[in-house]
Amino acid sequence: MAHAERTFIAIKPDGVQRGLVGEIIKRFEQKGFRLVAMKFLQASEELLKQHYIDLKDRPFFPGLVKYMNSGPVVAMVWEGLNVVKTGRVMLGETNPADSKPGTIRGDFCIQVGRNIIHGSDSVKSAEKEINLWFKPEELIEYKPCAFDWIYE
């Protein structure tokens, strides 16, 4: 696929606990994106500190790491045309109060501290996050049968 890119999406502990994993995956699949990798894990503090290293000096950093370490997460890599930008639109605003209905956060969240999902904010950060959470051999290449019906 020409100009395909990848993004990192993580369903946070509150999204897992609330049983929203299937709904979130469904939305990305129905949009036409291809799942490249997925794992269900209890993220270590070390991994989370690396993931959120850009926020390490912010006052909410310790609470963010604690929250993300409080339960299992679903880490995923999705691929498709403009998947980073489109994925962010699908997620909604970081603050659910600013998210439109029809977005994941607009439909399922109330507070910014429990916003159920993370998505890469740029192609560069997606590459960094994918490399942090996944080994190269965990990224699976395949062509979905609907591929030719989604892309020109």
Swiss-Prot record:
InterPro entries: NDK-like_dom, NDK-like_dom_sf, Nucleoside_diP_kinase, Nucleoside_diP_kinase_AS
Pfam assignment, any one: NDK
Coiled coil: none
Keywords recorded for this protein, A-Z: ATP-binding, Cell projection, Cytoplasm, DNA-binding, Kinase, Magnesium, Metal-binding, Nucleotide metabolism, Nucleotide-binding, Nucleus, Transcription, Transcription regulation, Transferase
Quaternary structure annotation from Swiss-Prot or TrEMBL: Hexamer of two different chains: A and B (A6, A5B, A4B2, A3B3, A2B4, AB5, B6). Interacts with CAPN8. Interacts with AKAP13. Interacts with ITGB1BP1 (via C-terminal domain region). Interacts with BCL2L10.
Similarity-based family: Belongs to the NDK family.
Protein name: Nucleoside diphosphate kinase B
Lineage: Eukaryota, Metazoa, Chordata, Craniata, Vertebrata
Gene: NME2
